[in-house]
Amino acid sequence: MLSLELVRAALDSQKLERSVFEPNATHASVAMILTRRGGVLEVCFIRRAEREGDPWSGQVAFPGGRASRLDESPAHVAERETREEVGLDINEGERIGSLPQRVIERNDLKNNLTLSPIVYYIESKKAEKATPLQKEEVAHVFWVPLAHLFNEDFVTEIEYPMGGQLRNFPGIKHDGEVIWGLTLRVLQSFSEAIGVSMPATC
């Protein structure tokens, strides 16, 4: 059974993991935010606004973004970006732990990007305040039951142009949205960390 207690126990060993910026790299962080409403554990997602120059334009993502020179750690990036994008002060909640960093290599990125995903928990009353604040970056905020992400009934495919041709990618559908790509890969890291397999795999 997927529960907050399971997530806490699985990620507790990651809390003290050395989480710093490596030299000569471009960094970004995302926040996988959990809340519990009516006994159901839910996850926060955003749909990015359609924006020229954004490699993930219009895609479903976690709140987060790139590090600035003033950011002291990956967690600081995730917390600042979440506050700016959707108005949630997740630093007032519980930082459960970190997922493995990912190095993202894309032709449309000037430099490789090191992504740090961090898992948080906030109370439901605070979660209700989530709303797009930066409309030029975030089009929509929504919550998905964690169990939904592990249900094979919602596995789908999405067509996306890459390398001059349309390719099919696995995803998870929810109320007209499709969670796929980098966000799905982060979810896979989460599933591996908690020891529960996901039916949708990249």
Locate each region found by the language model.
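Short amphipathic alpha-helical segments enriched in hydrophobics
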Residues: 11-18, 35, 53, 194, ...
